[in-house]
Structures are given as C-alpha cells and as structure tokens.
Amino acid sequence: RGRRPENVGFVRCDSVALIRCLPSDIGAAYAWESESIEGFIEIMDKIELKNALPEVFALRDDIRSEIWHQEVTFERGHLYLVEAGSGTGKSSLCSYIIGYRNDYQGIISFDRRNIRNYKVKDWVELRKRSLSHLFQELRLFPELTAYENVAIKNNLTGFKKKKQIEAWFDALGIGDKLHVPISRMSFGQQQRVAMIRALVQPFDFLLADEPISHLDEENGRTMGEIMMEEARSQGAGVIVTSIGKHIALDYEKTFRL
C-alpha cells in the first residue's frame, strides 16, 4: 500500500487549484509523484477529535453533542454511526476529516498528528491510500457513464479488476447502467455508482455521508454488505452518517451529533 502500481498511467498535475476542485478521491489520484508526509505511518489507526467545534457554532451555548466539544476517537477496524439532525454539522464533520475545510476550533488529529499541519500534497497522499469518502452530494461527472466515473479513478489506482467492478454493479442492480451517462440515472442509482467508486482504492477509513438516503431497503442492505466486506478485507474503519435513514449494520458505537 502507498506505492504506485506498475504499468498504471497517471496524469501529472502541478496545479493545486485543479486538485482542490476535483472530488477528493479522484483528485488524490493525480499525485502519484507527491512526496510522502514526513514521518507518515503507512497505516492510519486513529482519527481523534479534541474539543472540535465548527466556528459557526462558536457563539452558541446550547450545543448538546457527543462529538462537538468532546474527546472522540475513531479506530481502524471498527464501525461507527453518527446520527445528526439538520444543521448540526454532519457534512462539516466529514469535510474536516477529509481535509476539505478547516473552519473549526479545537484539534483533529490522525495518529496524534494535528491535521492543520498538513499541506495539500499531504492530503493528496492521505486520500490516495488512507481515506475514502462517499459524498452526500456524490460529486460524480454527469457527462460520463456510470462505469467511466468508476474507471477514471480505478485506472489510476489500479486497485480493482474490471470483473470485480462489474460484479458490484450487478449486485447493486445497476448492471444494465454501466454505459449510461450519470445525467440519465436516478439519484438512488447514482448513489450506488458513488459507493463503488469509493471502494476502488486502498483505505484505512471510509466516510459514508448518508449513503442510502435514496435507496430502498433491499438495495440499502446490499450496499451495506458490499461496503463492509471490502472494509473488512482492508481492516478499515467505517464512519456512516445519517439524518434518520441509515444502513442496518452492527454498529459498535453510535454518536449523537
């Protein structure tokens, strides 16, 4: 893990702006040549929050949360559910952990390293081999087909064989949508494509932000099974967020945001 597979092409990108504008899991693939984080441990074991709080909540005195203003640890190999009400900072939490935003108070650290000290190249490296993210808003490319959205990432990571990807499409009931543009698919179908894309890379933690909000019970259950099978095979931790509807899994700990 952490090494570029042989015979896998890559796009050299010296533009920080381009990396930032791409979804984190896609943008990561554009930096195979980036230097490693100094002292970076190849496997990330813990994500820790200490008195973290979105700055927008700083003047509020009514915060009642099991995450904000608390000391919280997410450990590799474990399964967590973060339940939230609207406007409580659920997506902000994901954005902080994935490095998209830093407008928070307190400390967030990976294996005791304060993430505020990470530079863009460091985040690229983390997203390449340690963090995968299923966005609530998905961030798929509408002009590309379902398979192309997955392949654009997998071609760069070289992590999964085409046969495995197609098997996931079939299992999730979208095997007939492989070559259909994303713009012509329902949001629920797009959610399944986004999940597959999130799985075609190595990761120590997977953040799934409302992954089944538009799925029926059967597809939600299948997605959960596929997600957990891949996470277990990598020994990874999984953090699922929800505003009510969530994947029925054996969560080891549930936090009320």
Per-segment meaning from a language model:
Residues I115-S132:
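ABC ATPase NBD coupling module
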Residues K162-K177:
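Conserved ABC ATPase "signature" region
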Residues M195:
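Hydrophobic anchor residue at the start of the ABC signature
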Residues I98:
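Helix-to-loop junction immediately C-terminal to a conserved catalytic motif
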Residues L206-D209:
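Catalytic Walker B motif of ABC-type/P-loop ATPase nucleotide-binding domains
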Residues G106-R116:
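Conserved ABC transporter NBD signature motif
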